[in-house]
Amino acid sequence: MKMKQDVMILTGAGQIGMAIARRMGYGKKIVVGDKKMENAEDIARIMNNAGFDTIPVEMDLSSRESILRLIAEARKYGEISMLVNAA
């Protein structure tokens, strides 16, 4: 049985968001959402290479449906315990 873990949602895949995630994301699954999937993938790759457990998700903060999809994706991994909106 897979244990669920705390989940951090990070919106805005930039340097400020990544710095906050590096400081606050230890022990959490980090879901990185950005309007450009390439940006989310870049941050996820950097974070994963640094030992974090990170997945990228394409999302648009101006779209309610997109936000709900991001939340649903994050909930697959556990309880959302932190939201960092760095977009």
Question: What are the residue ranges of the model-derived segments?
Answer:
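The beta1-alpha1 cofactor-binding region of Rossmann-like NAD(H)/NADP(H)-dependent oxidoreductases
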Residues: E38, M59-R69
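Conserved glycine-rich Rossmann-like NAD(P)H-binding loop of the short-chain dehydrogenase/reductase
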Residues: Y26-I43
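Hydrophobic/aromatic anchor residues within beta-strands of the central parallel beta-sheet
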Residues: T54-P56
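Conserved catalytic-site loops of classical short-chain dehydrogenases/reductases
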Residues: V7, S81-M82
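Canonical Rossmann dinucleotide-binding motif of NAD(H)/NADP(H)-dependent dehydrogenases/reductases
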Residues: K2-V31
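Conserved NAD(P)H cofactor-binding loop of Rossmann-fold oxidoreductase domains
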Residues: A86-A87
